[in-house]
């Protein structure tokens, strides 16, 4: 098979498990916590590194912001051998008791985005793989980390999340909002692959604190610290999968 047109990888270039942050800068941050790493390819928003952690080989690939670019990453990585996708990103809290720096493991994602709907009807569930979900939760518990576990929402319009929308999501007891998980979950399910997601809270929309970091350099200090903790949880989950 020829190199994929956007990720510029082919069969044999990547491993079966991939961590997929949004921010290309976070690829290096994840790689720095691994035992060794090697740059595989870099094009547009996609930076791909192979690494190993505690004896397990993995690939790290940024997806950029939003579901369209995340879908390209999942599509092309799955064509060259990736079977498990773990999103490690940031989110905005939708419940008043959640603070900046809290971590969320998603049990499902409401489809307030357009990409997954090009693949299937909105009625089809966007849910993580059971093993990916339980290993993320288990890795957090093994490290005595406090996390929120529950449903989230994936949305396309970062700057158009109105008070009405936020109130509706809050009333539905959705925990947080981000921009990629619904499509990652839906595509993985359709392909018979595994996917999970853990996100660090970088703002609270109910409290009026707009989530506002496009990169790790812009995150509040507490969120920066907990992004690293979320990365470690994800890496430990990788070794169990």
Curated annotation (Swiss-Prot):
Entry GO MF terms: guanosine phosphorylase activity; S-methyl-5-thioadenosine phosphorylase activity
UniProt keyword terms in alphabetical order: Glycosyltransferase, Transferase
SUPFAM superfamilies assigned to the protein according to its UniProt record, in alphabetical order: Purine and uridine phosphorylases
UniProt feature coiled coil, ranges: none
Enzyme class: transferase
Any GO BP annotation: nucleoside catabolic process
Temperature-related behavior of activity: Optimum temperature is 30 degrees Celsius.
CDD domains xrefs: UP_EcUdp-like (cd17767)
InterPro entries: Nucleoside_phosphorylase_CS, Nucleoside_phosphorylase_d, Nucleoside_phosphorylase_sf
Domain of life of the source: Archaea
Record function comment: Phosphorylase involved in the non-carboxylating pentose bisphosphate pathway, a nucleoside degradation pathway present in some halophilic archaea. Catalyzes the phosphorolytic cleavage of guanosine to guanine and ribose-1-phosphate (R1P). Exhibits the highest activity toward guanosine, but also shows lower activity against inosine and adenosine.
Family membership: Belongs to the PNP/UDP phosphorylase family.
Listed name of the protein: Guanosine phosphorylase
């Amino acid at each position: 098979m020829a190199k994929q047109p956007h990720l510029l990888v082919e069969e044999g270039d990547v491993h079966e498990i991939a961590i997929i942050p949004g921010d290309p800068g976070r690829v290096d941050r994840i790689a720095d916590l691994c035992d060794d790493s090697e740059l595989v390819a870099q094009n547009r928003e996609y930076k791909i590194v192979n690494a190993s952690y505690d004896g397990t080989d993995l690939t790290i690939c940024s997806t950029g912001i939003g579901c369209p670019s995340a879908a390209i990453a999942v599509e092309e990585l799955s064509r060259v051998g990736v079977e498990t996708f773990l999103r490690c990103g940031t989110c905005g809290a939708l419940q008043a008791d959640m603070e900046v720096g809290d971590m969320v493991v998603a049990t499902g994602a409401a489809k307030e985005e357009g990409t997954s709907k090009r693949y299937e009807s909105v009625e089809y569930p966007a849910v993580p793989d059971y093993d990916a979900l339980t290993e993320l939760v288990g890795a957090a518990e093994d490290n005595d980390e406090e996390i929120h576990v529950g449903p989230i929402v994936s949305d396309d319009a970062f700057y158009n999340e109105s008070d009405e929308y936020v109130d509706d999501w809050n009333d539905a007891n959705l925990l947080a909002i981000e921009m990629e998980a619904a499509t990652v979950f839906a595509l993985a399910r359709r392909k018979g692959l595994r996917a999970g997601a853990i996100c660090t809270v970088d703002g609270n929309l109910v409290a009026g604190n707009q989530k506002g970091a496009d990169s790790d350099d812009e995150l509040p200090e507490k969120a920066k610290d907990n992004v690293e903790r979320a990365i470690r949880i994800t890496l430990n989950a990788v070794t169990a999968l």
